[in-house]
């Protein structure tokens, strides 16, 4: 997906069962002791020091790398153009299980946002217009679950448009379905991005002005 969008990708490279980089470091479920009622032995009974060391090993490098990536995009010299260039978009990508705690999740995609719904609104419109996938807003998780931490830290605090995509993981079980979903999501993101640019700079959009590319971030799930 990042390649299709010509966007930088920052990936945590660690399962959320080890450390959930998309949670505030002080949150208990950043290192969950259980998942769906099943104990995670390596996470049970950790001391404060053990939790701190794990945060330093997984959370801190991921968020430093993401911050550096965004800083680089925002400070990058630009060639003079005749139209305004939009700021980057932060898009985080995760997956969810079709059934959790015995309850089937009736959706294909979740589009999540916190206080800034600009890009999420456009993504939802694009997915619904396509008509092939069932999409839900702030599901199967939402801000109250603490999952918008990355959006807050790196999107909201900088004023960047942002959204989080949750994919039902039986739709991406094979390399073929992963590639197909990546192509679909890249198309959705590009269409939403173009709509945002058109709304912000209607004259530039009519003139075919250049825009910056989205940023992609993934905390392993």
Region spans (language model):
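N-terminal catalytic or cofactor-binding beta/alpha core of small enzyme domains
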Residues: 1-90, 95-221
């Amino acid at each position: 997906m990042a390649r299709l969008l010509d966007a930088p990708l920052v990936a945590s490279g660690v399962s959320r069962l080890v450390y959930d980089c998309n949670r505030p470091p002080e949150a208990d479920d950043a290192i969950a002791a259980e998942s769906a009622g099943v104990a995670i032995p390596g996470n049970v009974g950790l001391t404060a020091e053990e939790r701190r060391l794990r945060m330093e090993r997984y959370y801190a490098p991921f968020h430093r790398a993401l911050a550096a990536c965004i800083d680089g995009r925002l400070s990058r010299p630009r060639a003079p153009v005749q139209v305004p260039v939009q700021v980057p978009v932060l898009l985080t990508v995760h997956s969810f299980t079709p059934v959790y705690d015995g309850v089937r999740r009736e959706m294909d995609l979740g589009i999540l946002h916190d206080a800034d719904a600009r890009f999420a609104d456009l993504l939802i419109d694009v997915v619904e217009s396509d008509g092939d996938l069932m999409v839900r807003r702030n599901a199967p998780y939402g801000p109250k679950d603490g999952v918008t931490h990355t959006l807050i830290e790196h999107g909201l605090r900088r004023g960047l448009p942002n959204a989080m995509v949750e994919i039902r993981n039986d739709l991406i079980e094979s390399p073929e379905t992963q590639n197909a979903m990546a192509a679909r999501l890249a198309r959705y993101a590009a269409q939403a991005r173009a709509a945002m640019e058109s709304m912000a700079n209607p004259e530039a959009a009519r003139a075919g002005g250049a825009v910056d590319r989205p940023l992609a971030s993934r905390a392993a799930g």
